[in-house]
């Protein structure tokens, strides 16, 4: 839960299911009795990765990851871009599981508070908010953004992602069977999805790549066209990252046999993407 200093007290708010009850202080509207019955899980705060949020399905304004209904979510990542407008601040938050996620925080124009301060790019943050979709583009509308000073909190968040979704999947699965969710967590975290085993993310448990390298490899894998992904598109998807760093990573992945060029030296496909 959020502590009195505006930070996030990660451990104490976890329930037996690995996810957190939404305190009244989060500003969520009180549900009606009907909503309580039909959407019993939607008031939980669910720890997620960006990849999970981007792949969440939507039906009648309700988002789900597998059988888990989402309303309030938590992600942890690094701010790649920050842009302040009169009424809101738009961030791009990158947890290295997919392209950076748009996070919008509305500001109080009537008073100068810490909520109105822009978190600078390069800072790690923990974001709590609501998943939204507009014109088929998902984003998070944040009601709390707190800086992360200890990188152990990033590791802890990924473990919470694994634990909470395992528990909620097992609770929602039919007797005698279970649904499996690909968590798609950063490769160096060693977090997989096979019954909770720590087996490495992104369908490549022992590739030995860094999170940055895995992120670029997964973006290239996601392109199903015969021509592969253009380097220009890769730059656009990784907005805020240093272009030279992207180029060096692409060259490394090519030299190591993870990707190959297609129609020219600016288009790439994964060697195991078919």
UniProtKB/Swiss-Prot annotation:
Keyword Repressor (UniProt): no
Keyword line: DNA damage, DNA recombination, DNA repair, DNA replication, DNA-binding, Nucleus, Phosphoprotein
DNA-binding region per Swiss-Prot/TrEMBL record: 73-147
Cross-referenced CDD domains: RPA2_DBD_D
Compartments, as annotated in UniProt: Nucleus; Nucleus, PML body
Any one Gene Ontology molecular-function term assigned to this protein's record: damaged DNA binding
Region feature (Disordered): 1-42
Domain of life of the organism encoding this protein: Eukaryota
Cystine pairings recorded for this chain: none
Post-translational modification remark: Differentially phosphorylated throughout the cell cycle, becoming phosphorylated at the G1-S transition and dephosphorylated in late mitosis. Phosphorylation increases upon replication fork stalling.
Principal localisation: nucleus
Entry-linked InterPro entries: NA-bd_OB-fold, RFA2-like, Rfa2/RPA32, RPA_C, WH-like_DNA-bd_sf, WH_DNA-bd_sf
Segments of skewed composition (Gly residues): 7-27
GO BP annotation list: base-excision repair; DNA replication; DNA replication checkpoint signaling; double-strand break repair via homologous recombination; mismatch repair; nucleotide-excision repair; protein localization to chromosome; regulation of DNA damage checkpoint
Pfam families, per database record: RPA_C (PF08784)
Cellular-component GO terms for this entry: chromatin; chromosome, telomeric region; DNA replication factor A complex; nucleus; PML body; site of double-strand break
Cited function: As part of the heterotrimeric replication protein A complex (RPA/RP-A), binds and stabilizes single-stranded DNA intermediates, that form during DNA replication or upon DNA stress. It prevents their reannealing and in parallel, recruits and activates different proteins and complexes involved in DNA metabolism. Thereby, it plays an essential role both in DNA replication and the cellular response to DNA damage.
Quaternary assembly: Component of the replication protein A complex (RPA/RP-A), a heterotrimeric complex composed of RPA1, RPA2 and RPA3.
Entry similarity comment: Belongs to the replication factor A protein 2 family.
PANTHER family reported for this sequence: REPLICATION PROTEIN A-RELATED, REPLICATION PROTEIN A2
Protein name: Replication protein A 32 kDa subunit-B
Native source organism of the sequence: Xenopus laevis (African clawed frog)
